[in-house]
């Protein structure tokens, strides 16, 4: 780059007529900013200077006010590129002589006698009776109309929604019922999905508690990371498949899933037993056979109109039948208690003590409060994992 030179020019900058006062193009003859070459370093001694007299003229061109190229610029040879502004006429174009090309005004509605001639047939008795129906009348006469063939202008105020439905004939389906039918299950699905995501976190929470028992006072660390497997430092509850502790983690999760399933089955069994849907015959001491057949001494037969038998019959060897009614609630629990009392005789000795302890209600409540105060913080980490199951248990308890 530089000023004037006697060497032949190459590439960009060979057109000396293109103004370049700032030296943006390489090897241009006008380069006062970036320095001239060694042959003629002075701007004043350049014999081929382009004084560019048009640069002093004030105008709006391609390069802004006061900077108008005299013979075209980067934007071309247009008048706007050279700074010459063309005035724009402010006179609007003449109106179109074709008046039929635009939007036509709405034509006046024809009289009722022309548009609906059947409405003028007043000699028909059946048609006259049909017009007494507001829905049929609304089809032929708008609001405020008469049967004389002329239509009265509609009032300026909006009519009630009932008049609209009366003029349209059959009522439109209530959209509120449709939307409620579609949107009603959405909160249920959202709550179910939330509970499902919370339930899926139960195995991980219980797994963390299980592994924490092996690291009392410290953070749980997987013991398989020091083996030959290239595993980084991680928790035993999130072992990768290449870690030797991955199999033990899966085994713990499987046992936890079985425990949760057993807990749900126990709750369902307790619920069915409370509702009286488990017709378990009580354990009758000294009986040889027990069946649910019809009994002579039982007021309600065992196989009657009820879904479940309401009494159990014992048939000793002498042929006489004895009926014992099934408890309407907690039949299975009473059966288990009787069975345990027969197998473990010392349980019957606890009955008076339990009855006496329950009778002392202040003592029971104080003992429960003391146990919750002492063991509550340590048990909360375990019980809190089962909180998502409580809404499911509550729904089953209410609707079954």
Swiss-Prot record:
Spans annotated as Pre-S2: 120-174
Record PTM text: Isoform M is N-terminally acetylated by host at a ratio of 90%, and N-glycosylated by host at the pre-S2 region. Myristoylated.
Location of the protein in the cell: Virion membrane
Lipidation (N-myristoyl glycine): 2
Residue intervals on the Virion surface side: 2-181, 275-348, 399-400
Keywords, in A-Z order: Acetylation, Caveolin-mediated endocytosis of virus by host, Fusion of virus membrane with host endosomal membrane, Fusion of virus membrane with host membrane, Glycoprotein, Host-virus interaction, Lipoprotein, Membrane, Myristate, Transmembrane, Transmembrane helix, Viral attachment to host cell, Viral envelope protein, Viral penetration into host cytoplasm, Virion, Virus endocytosis by host, Virus entry into host cell
Biased composition (Polar residues): 97-106
Role this protein plays: The large envelope protein exists in two topological conformations, one which is termed 'external' or Le-HBsAg and the other 'internal' or Li-HBsAg. In its external conformation the protein attaches the virus to cell receptors and thereby initiating infection. This interaction determines the species specificity and liver tropism. This attachment induces virion internalization predominantly through caveolin-mediated endocytosis. The large envelope protein also assures fusion between virion membrane and endosomal membrane.
Record comment regarding domains: The large envelope protein is synthesized with the pre-S region at the cytosolic side of the endoplasmic reticulum and, hence will be within the virion after budding. Therefore the pre-S region is not N-glycosylated. Later a post-translational translocation of N-terminal pre-S and TM1 domains occur in about 50% of proteins at the virion surface. These molecules change their topology by an unknown mechanism, resulting in exposure of pre-S region at virion surface.
Name of the protein: Large envelope protein
UniProt organism field: Hepatitis B virus genotype A2 subtype adw2 (isolate Germany/991/1990)
Source lineage: Viruses, Riboviria, Pararnavirae, Artverviricota, Revtraviricetes
